[in-house]
Amino acid sequence: QLTMSFEKVFEIAPIFRAEPSRTNRHLSEAISIDFEEAYVDYNDVMKRIEQIINQVILSMQEFSKDNHDVDFVIPVILDTIPQYTYADLLEKIQATGAKSQWGDDLYPAQLSKIGITGFYFIKDWPIGPKPFYVKVSKDNPKISESFDLMYGDLEISSGSTRIEKKSELEDRMKNKGMKIDTFSYHLNVFDYGVPPHAGCGIGLERLMMALTGIENIRDTTFYPRDVDRLTP
């Protein structure tokens, strides 16, 4: 909504979620890097993410020149991050014997079996599992203009082209069984005209895991908070 006034909007801020998972990659409190940009689509957002990751890698390389006790391998600058469609990877997963069907999520255990390493994008997801504000593809109504950034089987970011029309948002909400009246505070803004826009959220702790080789997300933050720990 802020793209009505500001063409580019970003924030780096805490996020909180009632996360029930006890794994090495889930926290109940984390830092998210979020940005939204007007007059772009999800392809532009993926390019922005490439730029962000390469800038971080460049900063790590510069830091390591004066700090020789860095105990992990500094990544190399990426020419480009590979892109796979959801359909491509679903086919590969099914070839391993999995019973996954169109519209199912792609789980870490399944992704690890197909052996893709490093950073890559999974794009053009089915519309079903994606949030109500994600735009439907112009070419195929079953597909959304969305992506996930992965590192091996670890999800780092999710993003999409966003819906900018109120009527389209309301239709999507109805299809998902949502009560439109409870979202009036969100929908009313669209009466004043929202530009076409796209954006994403990047999990900082998970990005640090990918760039440093740290295997447990709790080691990327001073005070990890999860399903079992609230303080400090």
What are these model-derived regions, one by one?
Residues S5, F35, L89, I122, ...:
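A residue-level signal for conserved active-site and pocket-lining positions in enzyme catalytic cores
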Residues S160-T161, K166-P232:
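Active-site pocket scaffolds in enzymes
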Residues Q1-A38, N188, M209:
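Class II aminoacyl-tRNA synthetase-like tRNA-binding/catalytic domains
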Residues M46-G152, K174-P195:
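Metal-assisted phosphate- and nucleotidyl-transfer catalytic regions
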Residues L2-T3, E7, R17-S21, I53-Q61, ...:
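Hydrophobic/aromatic-lined pockets within catalytic cores
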Residues E7-V9, A30-S32, I116-F119, S144-S146, ...:
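Active-site lining segments that contact anionic ligands and/or coordinate catalytic metals
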Residues S21-E29, S137-F147, T161:
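A glycine-rich, aromatic-flanked flexible loop/lid motif
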Residues D34-V45, D153-E155:
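A generic structural motif
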